[in-house]
């Protein structure tokens, strides 16, 4: 078991009293500027050519496109049968890495299919600005609870599609590696096939995942970093490596103040690079490479929180395999959700009502 020592005393669960983690400096020059407003829970978005934001609305089933240059908005497709209860709904979106030459749009949705609620990755073809030819690439039972569905999808530097599949509020799923996709990060080819170099001869890339909402690839190393939500303790930031176990499972507990007290299930569990003793509802993550937020931000990652809206800057060690420091640089007030890199390398994030850009003032 690897030992990691970076600790933050964070916030409590949604609906409870929120305690500050590391208060944002009053002199911090980082602020947020809304670029798209009046949206209905845009929990996931991505960018396409021509300063276009592709986003999903959690409960409506809609995939929409907003042109930042003209401030115009259009419907791409409405996914049928979407269930937006709890943490279900339209949860992820990605464009094919060669879009528009490969005109495919991918979404992760909780929807009625095959006679039950399922979490599915769907691929649509962009035909004259409308989504057609729906194809199911992945389908997993959503479970009886509306929580822990995952949903983040993104293409990696290797051209493969990665997706978070939550444990469906059943902690045993995370350690079940016998034909169980829940509680995992999966990796598939753009057409849904299983890559031959996956570690378990199936879609699973890593296991022991609980209730993650975010991951991103470090542009300097291609390494995958993930954010993870604990029960009532120990939200995490993890360095994800092929075939590893990230320790969440049926014995999760908060009897103690270290990650070893909460996520030690299964073989050789990997402990986090950083954790919060109390939860902040950690969400998206994005890397700054020329994001124009100051020299101290270049090479750092920015992570969000749904409980208190704090934006935290994460600084890495020289090898970029560990975390050297962290600080809250902006307090959004309300929760922040997905984080993405957009035009000009700028960092954007969504909240429950719109999409925002981090700026330096």
Regions found by a protein language model. Give the residues of each.
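Surface loop/turn motifs at the tips and blade-to-blade linkers of beta-strand repeat domains
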Residues: 34-40, 77-85, 138-144, 203-208, ...
């Amino acid at each position: 078991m690897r030992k990691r020592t970076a600790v933050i005393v964070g916030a409590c669960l949604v609906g409870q009293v929120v305690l500050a983690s590391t208060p944002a400096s009053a002199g911090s020059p980082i602020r947020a500027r809304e670029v798209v407003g009046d949206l209905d829970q845009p929990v996931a978005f991505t960018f396409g050519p021509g300063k276009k934001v592709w986003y999903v609305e959690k409960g409506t089933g809609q995939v929409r496109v907003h042109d930042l240059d003209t401030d115009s908005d259009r419907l791409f497709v409405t996914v049928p049968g979407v269930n937006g209860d709890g943490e279900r709904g339209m949860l992820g979106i990605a464009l094919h890495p060669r879009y528009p030459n490969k005109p495919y749009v991918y979404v992760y949705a909780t929807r009625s299919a095959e006679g039950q609620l399922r979490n599915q990755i769907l691929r649509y073809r962009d035909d004259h600005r409308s989504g057609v030819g729906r194809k199911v690439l992945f389908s997993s039972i959503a479970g009886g609870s509306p929580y822990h569905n995952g949903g983040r999808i993104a293409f990696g530097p290797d051209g493969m599609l990665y997706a978070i599949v939550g444990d469906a509020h059943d902690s045993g799923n995370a350690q079940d590696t016998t034909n169980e996709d829940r509680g995992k990060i999966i990796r598939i080819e753009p057409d849904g096939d299983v890559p031959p170099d996956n570690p378990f001869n199936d879609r699973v890339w890593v296991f022991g995942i609980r209730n993650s909402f975010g991951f991103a690839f470090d542009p300097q190393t291609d390494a995958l970093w993930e954010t993870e939500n604990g029960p009532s303790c120990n939200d995490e930031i993890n360095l994800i490596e092929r075939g590893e176990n990230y320790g969440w499972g049926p014995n999760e507990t908060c009897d103690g103040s270290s990650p070893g007290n909460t996520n030690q299930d299964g073989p050789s569990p990997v402990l986090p690079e950083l954790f919060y003793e109390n939860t902040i509802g950690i969400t998206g993550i994005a890397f700054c490479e020329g994001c124009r937020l100051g020299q101290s931000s270049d090479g750092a990652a920015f992570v969000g929180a749904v409980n208190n809206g704090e934006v935290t800057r994460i600084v890495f060690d020289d090898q970029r395999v560990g975390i050297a420091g962290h600080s809250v640089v902006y307090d959004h007030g309300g929760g922040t959700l997905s984080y993405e890199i957009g035009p000009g390398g700028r960092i954007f994030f969504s909240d429950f009502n719109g999409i925002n850009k981090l700026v330096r003032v």
